[in-house]
Design a protein with these regions (language model features):
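Charged, amphipathic alpha-helical oligomerization/scaffolding segments
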Residues: 18, 22, 153, 223, ...
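Glycine- and acidic
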Residues: 5-12, 80-81, 203-211
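Short secondary-structure junctions and interdomain/linker hinges
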Residues: 5-12, 128, 161-168, 231, ...
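C-terminal effector/catalytic modules and regulatory tails appended to multi-domain proteins
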Residues: 175-277
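Catalytic cores of large soluble enzymes that bind and process phosphate-bearing ligands
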Residues: 15, 87, 216
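Acidic/His-rich, divalent-metal-binding segments that scaffold phosphate/diphosphate chemistry
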Residues: 1-78, 258-277
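A general structural signal for alpha-helical elements within enzymatic catalytic domains
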Residues: 28, 32-35, 100, 104, ...
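Divalent metal-dependent catalytic cores for phosphoryl transfer on phosphate-bearing substrates
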Residues: 35-201
């Protein structure tokens, strides 16, 4: 679909494929497995399509980005930001704008499918803070129900985790085009987040790196925890809490020792053993 899209709209960078896989994997990780199996085919289609299209807006040129800034009414919020800062902050909303304008080329199964995907993109583009504004569910002509709120909630957290996974304070996106491939690989290998996994109903994030790098990750994780709490609270306001698709009840951050700290600790242990002798 992206290849077809690029032929008709060549100003789009093909950035989103691998990130789409990360989002899908994290959605799978944080969803209740039985409820995941019970999703109907239309819900699966909308969730995966929203994950796929979430970041196609990252490659807009200045002219089209300005047009979408006007359309979204965010001129004031972007006045003091650089092109890349605007793109980094609002690219998911730009993705929604692209689907609104050009989505028909993808031949979605119905207008309701397209509408559901766009609504989810708007939700995660607004940092997952307006769940109450989403419709509870959409009923299709085949009588399948798309649980819009539940899917959007999972997608929002999955997207935030995918972005967290690749966070790296060494990497300057303003200078990204100046890096060669070996340098970019080096950045990826030094990512601060080492693992994200579910343990006993908790999502455990393990991170290392320098103090400054860890502080950045800690700030990002705290935002994810705060958003997750708001999302779950919003879902819990309803009488049927069983509709919640999450398998996790909390998110935790654990710090791993950096290579430098680990080496220092090992050296100290060796010195103590020598002194004991």
């Amino acid at each position: 679909m992206l290849e077809k899209y690029k032929k008709l709209y060549p100003n789009i960078s093909d950035y989103s494929i691998m990130h789409f896989i990360d989002i899908a994997e994290f959605c799978d990780m944080i969803m209740d497995k039985q409820k995941l199996k019970n999703l109907n085919e239309d819900e699966c289609y909308c969730l995966l399509s929203a994950a796929l299209f979430a970041h196609i807006g990252f490659g807009l040129n200045q002219e089209i980005m300005n047009r979408y800034v006007d359309k979204l009414g965010i001129q004031k919020q972007t006045e003091e930001l650089t092109f890349f800062q605007v793109m980094s902050k609002y690219h998911v909303l730009f993705s929604a704008c692209l689907l609104e304008e050009y989505g028909d080329i993808f031949e979605f199964p119905s207008d309701l499918h397209k509408y559901a995907i766009i609504r989810m993109l708007h939700f995660i583009g607004e940092n997952g803070t307006a769940l109450v504004q989403l419709e509870e569910a959409l009923v299709l002509n085949n009588q399948n129900v798309i649980r819009l709120k539940e899917l959007a909630a999972v997608l929002a957290v999955g997207n935030q985790l995918a972005e967290l996974k690749n966070a790296n304070i060494d990497l300057s996106y303003d200078k990204f085009d100046k890096y060669n491939s070996e340098e970019i690989v080096g950045f990826v290998e030094r990512n601060v987040v080492r693992s994200i996994k579910v343990k006993d109903g908790k999502l455990v994030i393990e991170a290392g790196g320098s103090d400054s790098a860890y502080t950045l990750i800690e700030r990002k994780v705290n935002l994810i925890i705060d958003n997750f709490g708001k999302i779950v609270s919003s879902l819990s306001d309803r009488s049927d809490y069983s509709l919640n698709l999450f398998s996790i009840v909390s998110i935790e951050l654990h710090r791993l020792p950096s290579a430098e700290t680990a080496g220092k600790n090992l050296s100290e242990q060796r010195n103590r053993r020598i002194m004991d002798r």
